[in-house]
């Protein structure tokens, strides 16, 4: 393996985004995943259905060129609603105005979008069912 070849373990949100960014920059990125490819087998979940995406997450999507793809399916969340015992409800905003919000996106859709982008950029996804990464031999 040379220094331009990078191996990633895990094709979740972070692994898929990192593979995309590395491949876009000319690195040979290979992602190993023990679960089936959700684009073929369907998204299996295991975590919450929706994901709250803040500005830091949008930044990563912008750098990868994916914000335009995800923005139309994101739902703005301005704050949380507190229901008091006396019956009235109160919105506790996440920020001062609508420039300081978080966004709800479907985790499966985001993951599959990131995997598509990684593959389109030249990254390789290798599915190793029922195998785990237990040791790493770093390059000297």
Where on the chain are the PLM-derived regions?
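Glycine-rich FAD pyrophosphate-binding loop
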Residues: 9, 23-46
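Short, hydrophobic alpha-helix immediately C-terminal to the catalytic nucleophile
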Residues: 16, 20, 111-112
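Beta1/beta-strand and adjacent pyrophosphate-binding region of the FAD-binding site
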Residues: 1-14
């Amino acid at each position: 393996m040379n220094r331009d070849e990078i191996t990633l373990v895990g094709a979740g949100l972070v692994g898929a985004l990192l593979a995309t960014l590395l491949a876009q920059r000319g690195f040979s990125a290979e992602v190993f995943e023990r679960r089936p490819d959700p684009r073929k087998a369907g998204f299996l979940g295991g975590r919450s259905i929706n994901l709250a995406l803040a500005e830091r997450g949008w930044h990563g999507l912008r750098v990868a060129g994916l914000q335009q793809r995800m923005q139309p399916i994101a739902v703005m969340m301005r704050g949380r609603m507190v229901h008091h015992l006396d019956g009235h409800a109160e919105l506790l905003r996440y920020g001062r105005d609508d420039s300081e919000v978080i966004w709800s996106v479907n985790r499966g859709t985001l993951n599959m979008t990131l995997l598509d982008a990684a593959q389109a950029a030249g990254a390789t996804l290798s599915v190793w069912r029922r195998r785990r990464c237990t040791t790493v031999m770093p390059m000297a």
